[in-house]
């Protein structure tokens, strides 16, 4: 597979005659694994519409990074055609090296202090009613980037008061007080992905700790029960069904509201192999099980991704909570948090 060049930062864009900087130098020693042909149920239309191009132009004009591009999301054509984009703050270089992820690994640059305003400007230009903001892991920062998340949320609120904000955060491992800073900024949805079952963490997500991530999501609810919490996993990495069901129980013990389950797709030959393409009927079975365990909302399809249909899902989340609790308890919770 061709090395993908960084085309997002005008100041660091490689020259045509310069050697490409490897995205994943830490994976160079790994043996190649064959990339399997995708089954028919995972085919998507290539992007290229006028609205897709307009969204790309706005992203470029504000010198922003999107996880849609960096992670090689298969839904980019559909989402950008709807002028939906998931902004990835704090640069395009991650301090961790998860075996499933296509985001560049290395030593990140200093934070762009103007980035929160740039994101807010792009949100306003795109006319987004709901925006998703994620980030690379920044273990090099004292607070893991918590203050940068907080400033970005605040900037969006100022520029687009009617826009709801969903964040997809790293785990802030060994960053005391970081989570509290982010929650105090009052995002509407707090998403932190578990990514896989605990038995696969050593090979899939080696820099993270499974129960730390569960506790992170639980702590969000303790700090502010009005914030919706969300988490997602990939399947097809060699997990067993009983492991996925146990993960559901762990997330429900943390009062997580929304679960997403999607098929893992291998970015390059150096990444973790796809052990299995899970058929659609098994995703439907996972969805049924998750609803039975009490999640307010479940999205489980081969092409499900954390930010896919996020705006529509937020409306469904609100409706589901209202139907479950009724208007009086919801209003009381909001008053208690704001007191």
Swiss-Prot record:
[4Fe-4S] cluster 2 binds at residues 94, 98, 101. It holds the Pfam family Radical_SAM. InterPro entries: Aldolase_TIM, Elp3/MiaA/NifB-like_rSAM, Lipoyl_synth, rSAM. Its cofactor is [4Fe-4S] cluster. [4Fe-4S] cluster 1 binds at residues 68, 73, 79, 307. Pathway: Protein modification; protein lipoylation via endogenous pathway; protein N(6)-(lipoyl)lysine from octanoyl-[acyl-carrier-protein]: step 2/2. Residues 13-35 are annotated as: Disordered. GO terms for molecular function: 4 iron, 4 sulfur cluster binding; lipoate synthase activity; metal ion binding. It catalyses: [[Fe-S] cluster scaffold protein carrying a second [4Fe-4S](2+) cluster] + N(6)-octanoyl-L-lysyl-[protein] + 2 oxidized [2Fe-2S]-[ferredoxin] + 2 S-adenosyl-L-methionine + 4 H(+) = [[Fe-S] cluster scaffold protein] + N(6)-[(R)-dihydrolipoyl]-L-lysyl-[protein] + 4 Fe(3+) + 2 hydrogen sulfide + 2 5'-deoxyadenosine + 2 L-methionine + 2 reduced [2Fe-2S]-[ferredoxin]. Binds 2 [4Fe-4S] clusters per subunit. One cluster is coordinated with 3 cysteines and an exchangeable S-adenosyl-L-methionine. Its main location: cytoplasm. One of its GO terms (cellular component) is cytoplasm. It is found in: Cytoplasm. It comes from the Bacteria. Coiled coil: none annotated. SMART domains: Elp3 (SM00729). Keywords: 4Fe-4S, Cytoplasm, Iron, Iron-sulfur, Metal-binding, S-adenosyl-L-methionine, Transferase. Its EC number is 2.8.1.8. Residues 80-296 form the Radical SAM core domain. Belongs to the radical SAM superfamily. Lipoyl synthase family. This is Lipoyl synthase. It comes from Methylorubrum extorquens (strain CM4 / NCIMB 13688) (Methylobacterium extorquens).
């Amino acid at each position: 597979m061709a090395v993908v060049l960084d085309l997002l930062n005008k100041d660091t864009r490689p020259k045509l005659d310069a050697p490409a900087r490897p995205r994943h130098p830490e994976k160079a020693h790994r043996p190649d694994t064959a990339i399997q042909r995708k089954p028919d149920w995972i085919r998507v239309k290539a992007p290229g519409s006028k609205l897709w191009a307009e969204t790309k132009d706005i992203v470029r004009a504000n010198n922003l990074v999107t996880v849609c591009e960096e992670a090689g999301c298969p839904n980019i054509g559909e989402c950008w055609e709807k002028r939906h984009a998931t902004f990835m703050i704090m640069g395009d270089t991650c301090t961790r090296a998860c075996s499933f992820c296509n985001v560049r690994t290395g030593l990140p640059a200093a934070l762009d202090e103007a980035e929160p305003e740039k994101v807010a400007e792009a949100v306003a230009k795109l006319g987004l009613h709901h925006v998703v903001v994620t980030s690379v892991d920044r273990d090099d920062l004292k607070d893991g980037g918590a203050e940068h998340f907080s400033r970005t949320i605040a900037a969006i609120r100022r520029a687009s008061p009617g826009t709801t904000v969903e964040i997809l955060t790293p785990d802030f491992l060994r960053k005391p007080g970081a989570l509290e800073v982010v929650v105090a900024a009052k995002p509407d949805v707090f998403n932190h992905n578990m990514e896989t079952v605990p038995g696969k963490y050593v090979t899939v997500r080696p820099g993270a700790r499974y129960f730390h991530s569960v506790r992170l999501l639980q702590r969000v609810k303790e700090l502010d029960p009005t914030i919706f919490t969300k988490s997602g996993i990939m399947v097809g990495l060699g997990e067993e069904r009983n492991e996925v069901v146990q993960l559901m129980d762990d997330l429900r013990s943390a009062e997580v509201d929304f679960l997403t389950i999607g098929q893992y797709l291998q970015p390059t030959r150096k990444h973790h192999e796809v052990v299995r393409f899970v058929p659609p009927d098994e995703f439907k079975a996972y969805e049924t099980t998750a609803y039975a365990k009490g999640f307010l909302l479940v999205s489980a399809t081969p092409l499900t991704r954390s930010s896919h249909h996020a705006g529509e899902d937020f409306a469904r989340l609100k409706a589901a909570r209202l139907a479950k609790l009724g208007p009086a308890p919801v209003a009381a919770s909001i008053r208690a948090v704001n007191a």
